[in-house]
Amino acid sequence: MKALVRVAVTGAAGQIGYSLLFRIAAGEMFGKDRSVILQMLELPDEKAQAALKGVMMELEDCAFPLLAGMVVTDNPDIAFKDADAALLVGSRPRGPGMERKDLLMENAKIFTAQGAALNKVARRDVKVLVVGNPANTNAYIAMKSAPDLNPKHFTAMLRLDHNRALSQLSTKLSKPVANIEKLIVWGNHSPTMYPDYRFATADGTPIIEAINDQAWNANSFIPTVSKRGAAIIEARGLSSAASAANAAIDHMRDWLLGSNGKWITMGVPSDGSYGIPEGMIFGFPVTTTNGEYSIVKDLPIDTFSKTYIDKTLAELEEERASIAHLLR
């Protein structure tokens, strides 16, 4: 059995948290040979803490062999103590009549505090995944609030967008998702993201040979992927939870255990690749090995792609500018 792993999960009693915790405890994120301690954070109000205790009771009742312990708390310093991994799921949702800039400001307060707590008490090599929206900018805020931690270890979740795009291509091609490789989602986890299959293959054959249809790409594929979250809310009355939790599992598992040479999409701090400003958390194609990721370099960016990448970059720059005064 490998060393015990401590994983902190914020918003632990929420819909995504509920879909996530049982799968972590079953060994789906860190492997079937690693015991886990779940360190669960929720809001300090009575209702949220009662719900969290109920989740803990259910986890106990599963008798997971790999679940070595649990902590439930409303204190980030306790939840993040010695954490090897931190999944920042909880965020302020957008309320009726709330402007996007108001949402950014509310979440900036949360992620400044959580970044500072991670900086204070987490392991120095902690790996952080931000799921709570707006995920890229929240990850940027947490990273900037944790100056003593490795900035490369602050990431945002674009894997849900990646998986959604994969599924759409699978349906279009009548091919299993497992046979499709080298798909990319560029940019922000928002409707401006750019799913890009120019380099993707199915059974080793370039997909653009099978789908050489820019009208389908622009008018069907990209809008379907970018608006999928809204379509699920309309159909279900609630936002994506199980699929978001599944994407978080995929993201962390591949980061920690390796992608075996396959391209995956992660929101990571830019190193200046593709003209994206250094430090901006942006969706890139990466490969992972030994717990570290590398951005896939030197892919050609055509005019069509540049238009979409510039649009998602502009949105991220606007978000970053709106919270810059909070990070001084």
Curated annotation (Swiss-Prot):
Enzyme class: oxidoreductase
Signal peptide: none
Keyword Glycosyltransferase: no
EC number: 1.1.1.37
CDD domains with a match to the protein in the record: MDH_chloroplast-like
Pfam families to which the protein is assigned, alphabetical: Ldh_1_C, Ldh_1_N
Binding site for NAD(+): 11-17, 107, 114, 131-133
Keyword annotations from UniProtKB, A to Z: NAD, Oxidoreductase, Tricarboxylic acid cycle
Catalytic activities: (S)-malate + NAD(+) = oxaloacetate + NADH + H(+)
GO molecular-function term, one example from the UniProt record: L-malate dehydrogenase (NAD+) activity
GO process terms (BP): malate metabolic process; tricarboxylic acid cycle
Highest taxon of the lineage: Bacteria
Positions of substrate binding: 94, 100, 133, 164
NCBIfam families in the record: MalateDH-SF1, PRK05442.1
Function of the molecule: Catalyzes the reversible oxidation of malate to oxaloacetate.
Name the record gives this protein: Malate dehydrogenase
Gene name per UniProt: mdh
